[in-house]
A protein has these predicted regions:
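A glycine/proline-hinged amphipathic helix-loop "lid/cap" segment
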Residues: 1-67, 299-303
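Alpha/beta-hydrolase superfamily serine-hydrolase fold, recognizing
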Residues: 54-60, 64-303
Length: 303
């Protein structure tokens, strides 16, 4: 049964959703993204977030209280490839570090419409290479939500093409797998999904692709090869725009004989694992269990 808290969050999302002038909003983001991201001081103090000086891309770190850590997490945040990290991201990552003995790295990759997909991918590469130097690839997790989930999968495909080691786990939360949003079943999700603006997503995807075909696998990783990648886990809600493509991805994996953890949460909205709801607590427990498990896929993924 769906929690009251999740219904309340959905109500808030519906209540606060605004009609957008897509062209005007993209111009606002273009202007905003010319400036560096500034982590609010209150979040920095509350979650003990530090900034690394090792990389050309601004990269923030959260550490568990127990050191040395067991896992390194490269987290690629969502936001339609045009938005910077939100408060919910930091709250989720703080909870992750408390439940998983880990250090989380959050590179604030370049955003559209100012930058395109290769700018984002290449900005993340030095961070991943640094994690490889710290320990074994099996202890590395690449995780992302929404656009960050799509970028996580595309980045893993990029690593495979370059012959670099795969991470131990790829955790995709409500991933944006196909920026074309051409799956006809997506239209059926519009009445159920209160959060993203479909028209804005379509234009953001075009801006992220630039002059490259939007079906290029590094933009829309559902069109890429997945047999040579690390262990893949997908979390998705049944009230999401991205549900049809997540199901398509699961079918594709099954046909290719690629085992994945695929977890659907009934009546959950976009990126539900980052919200303060009981379903998110359960999803986080599952994420930690997946990362810590030596068996794959997990047999018992009951909610």
């Amino acid at each position: 049964m769906r929690s009251i808290q999740s219904l309340f969050v959905e109500w808030l999302l519906v209540l606060t959703k605004k009609k957008l002038n897509v062209e005007g909003y993209l111009e606002e983001r273009r202007m905003a993204n010319q400036l560096p991201y500034v982590l609010p001081e209150k979040l920095k103090k509350k979650y003990h977030i530090t900034k690394s000086s090792m990389f050309s891309v601004d990269t923030y770190m959260l550490k568990s209280d127990v050191q040395p850590d067991d896992h390194q997490v490269l987290f690629l945040h969502g936001g339609g490839y045009i938005e910077q990290p939100l408060v919910w991201h930091w709250r989720f990552l703080d909870r992750l570090t408390k439940q998983l003995n880990s250090t989380v790295y959050v590179p604030v990759y370049p955003k559209a419409p100012n930058h395109q997909y290769m700018d984002a991918i290449e900005s993340v590469l030095p961070v991943y290479q640094a994690l490889l130097e710290k320990g074994t690839p099996e202890k590395i997790v690449i995780m992302g939500d929404s656009a960050g989930g799509g970028l996580s999968l595309a980045f893993a495909q990029y690593l495979a093409k370059k012959g670099l080691p795969q991470p131990g786990n790829l955790i995709l939360l409500s991933p944006w797998l196909d920026v074309t949003l051409s799956n006809p079943d997506i239209a059926k999700m519009v009445p159920k999904e209160p959060m993203p603006n479909l028209d804005l997503l379509i234009e953001s995807g075009k801006a992220y692709a630039g002059d490259t075909d939007e079906t290029h696998h590094l933009i829309s990783p559902i069109y890429g090869e997945i047999k040579s990648l690390g262990r893949i886990s997908v979390f998705i809600g049944t009230h999401e725009f991205f549900l049809p493509d997540a199901r398509k991805f699961k079918e594709m994996a099954d046909k290719q004989g690629v085992p994945i953890n695929y977890i659907e949460y009934p009546k959950m909205n976009h990126v539900f694992p980052v919200f303060p709801i009981p379903e998110a607590n359960q999803a986080l427990k599952q994420i930690v269990a997946i990362i810590e498990s030596k068996t794959f896929p997990l047999r018992d993924m009951t909610k």
